[in-house]
């Protein structure tokens, strides 16, 4: 069941050009003040049945959790990777995002002929991706494999935050805000200061006000 035909636009175009194994790539967690950035890569079969598949940001948490195992079960291949907060600080968030995407691609059990990457990263930055690829603006709305990758990346990151980081550092209440710069998060930072999982490069304005 394909919720919207346009979701397969990129895959149909790639198939018409002769690409067989087309992979979607997307990331999650670029904006939060803490934790790793995640990326996922997914190759979907033409006959997959993924009701309500869409960009993860347009899905409720319940729907993302429902789709997560279905994508894993039906995908020809899938992979999830992450780059830690410490490396984000050592380099920068864009480099970390590119590295996470390449790690996800490297983790696939099937080598893709073409990777479809969500967003516009053609200003020299996507050169870090060694797989043959195209950057698709709004890709998670016109590529089923990118949409599937967005779900895997988002759910994987949210689970890591709520099941691991929230328990390791309960005082910050990470499960409530997922690490984003909410009022609650800044209040906890004011009270406790940053923990090892915080991205210090993201806290420069906050630190300047202390």
Which role does the model predict for each range below?
Residues 1-210:
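RNase H-like, Mg2+-dependent phosphodiesterase core
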């Amino acid at each position: 069941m394909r919720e919207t035909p346009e979701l397969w636009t990129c895959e149909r175009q790639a198939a018409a050009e002769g690409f067989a194994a087309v992979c979607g790539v997307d990331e999650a967690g670029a904006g939060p003040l803490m934790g790793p950035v995640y990326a996922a890569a997914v190759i979907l079969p033409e006959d997959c049945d993924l009701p309500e598949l869409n960009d993860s940001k347009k899905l409720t948490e319940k729907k993302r959790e429902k789709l997560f195992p279905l994508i894993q079960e039906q995908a020809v291949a899938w992979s999830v990777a992450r780059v830690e907060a410490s490396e984000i600080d050592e380099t920068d968030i864009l480099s970390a995002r590119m590295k996470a995407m390449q790690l996800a691609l490297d983790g696939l059990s099937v080598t893709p002929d073409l990777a479809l990457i969500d967003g516009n990263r053609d200003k020299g930055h996507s050169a870090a991706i060694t797989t043959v690829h195209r950057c698709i603006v709004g890709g998670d709305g016109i590529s089923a494999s990118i949409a599937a990758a967005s779900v895997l990346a988002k759910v994987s990151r949210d689970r890591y935050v709520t099941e691991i980081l929230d328990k390791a550092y309960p005082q910050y209440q990470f499960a409530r805000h997922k690490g984003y710069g909410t009022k609650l998060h800044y209040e906890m930072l004011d009270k406790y200061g940053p923990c090892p999982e915080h991205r210090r490069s993201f806290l420069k304005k906050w630190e300047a006000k202390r």
